[in-house]
Amino acid sequence: MPGPSTLRWLAAGVYAAIGAVAAVDPARVPAVFGGTAGTPESRTEIRAVYAGIPIAFAVALAPLRGRGTAENGGMLRAVRDASAGMAIARLAGAAAERRLRLWPTGGFAALEVGLAAAAHQAARTG
C-alpha cells in the first residue's frame, strides 16, 4: 500500500483534474450523463459546484507544511466523508431510478469509493 503522502497526492490530483475539466469545459460534465449546459447560468453553476468543490478538496488534501496533525486529520476525514457520501448518494439515486450502468454511474461511484478509501488510509497512517 502506498504511503499516506502518496495517497494524498494521488487523491488531490484526481480532484484537481475533475475541477480543472469542469472549470475549462463545463458543458462536458452533463454531457457525460447525456445532458446539456445550454445557458451561461448552467455553465456557471457547474463551474461553482463541479469545479469549486473538487479544487477545494485538492487543496485540502495537499500535504502542506505548517498544518498541524489535528488539522490534517480533520481535512482528510472531511474529504473521506464527502467522497463516501457522494458514492452513497449516487448508488441510492441509481436504486431509486432502478438503473445502474457501469458507465458513467458505476465508474464514478467506484472512483468516489476509491478516493474515500485513500483519504481514510492517509488519515490512519499519516
Regions picked out by a protein language model, each given a short descriptive name:
Residues 1-126:
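Short amphipathic, positively biased membrane-proximal segments
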